[in-house]
């Protein structure tokens, strides 16, 4: 048996997944591993305006990229939270922010809020970020300093950790919005400058050896391209993993019915409209609409289930929602494959991106899945014996992340008090994963903590579950009975401190538009 260490990686497919993978692997392994990326010049990518988790900054830090280098090239803006609009009732909104939950006397502040909150806005009472979002503030001052100074110096943060190792230690206060195609273009230049070979060609066939492993891909103009490890970044088609290697796809459609989207890229006068520091998810009759603010435009799209809405109806609803600015903008209709591959790594093929899995755009998990998979590939990169435990570890980590996010998204629909259409009525009777159903019963009397959420790393800390449970409004919750016997004075002091801190930051921070205009960007 050939025990030579694998040192030739072939990535099939470009887009965000392909170029994030290429740039990360090249930075991780340098000249010790050759990386070739093959992408068609004719097959389009799904990428639209993208929103992210705050952990994405670790990706850019790993590549030694500073914000001023990549953000202007990608029309990027800051994201402090997701704003959920009309999920509980028309006109109601709440935020799921990037901000750790405070605790008082051993109980999360949300418990104290349920016991005796100062207002009916849990997000503004328990998080500073909600007020900054309502006021449209940037997380940075005009001199570039961050609202939380310790992160500028990185003195309080452990270095060199993966996302799963960071969770619970710190919470960076923002993520990003950016144009996916522009990020792919930027990372393409970064990767090629560092030795990644770029082949623009169509893959005609995937050839297997007598073991069933991929030996090479056959291209139209460049002939055979061989390698040791092949990375499938071919999107929903899954050309290598699903088609050539026959790995089955595990659908999540029984619990998450949205299977379609229509997207628009709409130029807007951001000086007049401002640049909100959040992703907006607005509930509609048969799904929800995302709004992602970028430099000079918004990315927006209607995510829906075709059993409840036709593509024509969805496009009309989206255009009416955006207004006259969308009149001449071309629509991009997308069929989504919701679920994950049974294995994301089989033999010598690893799927990353949509070929691995996708759990609809709600909560901005697409880029997170890519980033997590790349980190795990480096962590489990094989030696010459291709030890099966490395594949098993990788597959377990990737599956756990997607299954955990699935539970979290199901909670959004099950928990939404909105009940005015057949779609929203059906969200209350649809299948629920057994473990989630058990957890919800516990959360009704004890809010989520690290011991009673999904037990494996999936990028979502307990406070995220608290925000959704409290914000969507359909699941009855009550505080810990112990609080009826506790002194509320310390909690009241904490609520006051949050309100005072929020007022100070709203008064002193610039708006997002003011910040990016001052940075010299053409907004």
UniProtKB/Swiss-Prot annotation:
Respond yes or no to whether keyword Oxidoreductase is given for this record: yes
The question of whether Oxidoreductase is a record keyword is answered with: yes
Binding of FAD occurs at 14, 40, 43, 46, 48, 51, 203, 354, 367
The protein's matches in InterPro entries, at most eight in alphabetical order, are given as: FAD/NAD-bd_sf (IPR036188), Flavin-dep_Halogenase_NPB (IPR050816), Flavin_halogenase (IPR006905), Trp_halogen (IPR033856)
Which keywords, in A-to-Z order, does the entry hold? FAD, Flavoprotein, Nucleotide-binding, Oxidoreductase
Quote the temperature dependence note: Optimum temperature is 40 degrees Celsius.
Q: Name one Pfam family in it.
A: Trp_halogenase
Gene3D superfamilies the record matches:
FAD/NAD(P)-binding domain
Result when mutating residue 462 to T: Decreases activity but still produces only 6-chlorotryptophan. Shows similar activity to the wild-type, but exhibits a switch in regioselectivity and produces 32% 5-chlorotryptophan and 68% 6-chlorotryptophan
Binding positions for chloride per the UniProt entry: 365-366
List the Gene Ontology MF annotations in alphabetical order.
Answer: monooxygenase activity; nucleotide binding
What positions are marked as the site Important for activity?
363
Write the Enzyme Commission number(s) for this entry: 1.14.19.59
SUPFAM superfamilies per record: FAD/NAD(P)-binding domain (SSF51905)
How does it associate, per the subunit comment? Homodimer.
As for family, the record states:
Belongs to the flavin-dependent halogenase family. Bacterial tryptophan halogenase subfamily.
- Record-given protein name: Tryptophan 6-halogenase SttH
> What is the species of this protein?
Streptomyces toxytricini
């Amino acid at each position: 048996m050939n025990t030579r260490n694998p040192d030739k990686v072939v990535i099939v497919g470009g887009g965000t997944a392909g170029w994030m993978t290429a740039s990360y692997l090249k930075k991780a392994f340098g000249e010790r591993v050759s990386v070739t990326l093959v992408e068609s010049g004719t097959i389009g990518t799904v990428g639209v305006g993208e929103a992210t988790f705050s952990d994405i900054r670790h990706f850019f830090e790993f590549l030694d990229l500073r914000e001023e280098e990549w953000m202007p090239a990608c029309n990027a803006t800051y994201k402090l939270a997701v704003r959920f609009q009309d999920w509980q009732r028309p006109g109601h909104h709440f935020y799921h922010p990037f901000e750790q939950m405070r605790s008082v006397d051993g109980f999360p502040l949300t418990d104290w809020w349920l016991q005796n909150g100062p207002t009916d806005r849990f997000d503004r009472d328990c998080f500073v970020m909600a007020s900054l979002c309502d006021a449209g503030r940037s997380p940075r001052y005009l001199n570039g300093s961050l609202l939380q100074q310790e992160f500028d110096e990185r003195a309080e943060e452990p270095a060199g950790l993966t996302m799963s190792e960071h969770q619970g230690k710190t919470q960076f206060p923002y993520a990003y919005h950016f144009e996916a195609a522009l990020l792919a273009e930027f990372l393409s230049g970064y990767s090629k400058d560092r030795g990644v070979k770029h082949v623009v060609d169509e893959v005609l066939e995937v050839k297997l050896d007598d073991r069933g492993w991929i030996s090479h891909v056959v291209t139209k103009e460049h002939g055979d391209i061989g390698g040791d490890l092949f990375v499938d970044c071919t999107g929903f088609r899954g050309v290598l993993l699903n088609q050539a290697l026959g790995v089955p796809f595990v659908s999540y459609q029984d619990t998450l019915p949205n299977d379609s989207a229509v997207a628009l890229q709409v130029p807007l006068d951001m000086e007049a409209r401002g640049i909100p520091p959040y992703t907006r998810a607005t509930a509609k009759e048969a799904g929800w609409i995302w709004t992602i603010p970028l430099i000079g435009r918004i990315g927006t799209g209607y995510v829906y289930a075709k059993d409840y809405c036709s593509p024509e109806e969805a496009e009309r609803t989206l255009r009416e929602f955006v207004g006259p600015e969308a009149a001449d903008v071309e629509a991009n209709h997308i069929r989504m494959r919701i679920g994950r591959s049974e294995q994301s790594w089989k033999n010598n093929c690893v799927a990353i991106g949509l070929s691995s899995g996708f759990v609809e755009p709600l909560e901005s998990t697409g880029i997170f899945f890519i980033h997590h998979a790349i980190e795990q590939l480096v962590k489990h990169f094989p030696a010459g014996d291709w030890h099966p435990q490395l594949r098993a570890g990788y597959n377990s980590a990737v599956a756990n992340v997607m299954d955990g996010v699935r539970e979290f998204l199901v909670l959004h629909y099950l928990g939404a008090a909105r009940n005015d259409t057949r779609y929203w009525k059906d969200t209350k009777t649809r299948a629920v994963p057994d473990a989630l159903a058990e957890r919800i019963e516990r959360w009704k009397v004890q809010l989520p903590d690290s011991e009673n959420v999904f037990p494996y790393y999936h990028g979502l800390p307990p406070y995220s579950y608290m925000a959704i449970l409290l914000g969507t409004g359909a699941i009855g919750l009550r505080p810990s009975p112990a609080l009826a016997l506790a002194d509320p004075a310390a909690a009241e002091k904490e609520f006051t401190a949050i309100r005072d801190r929020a007022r100070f930051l709203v008064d002193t921070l610039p708006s997002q538009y003011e910040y990016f205009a001052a940075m010299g960007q053409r907004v």
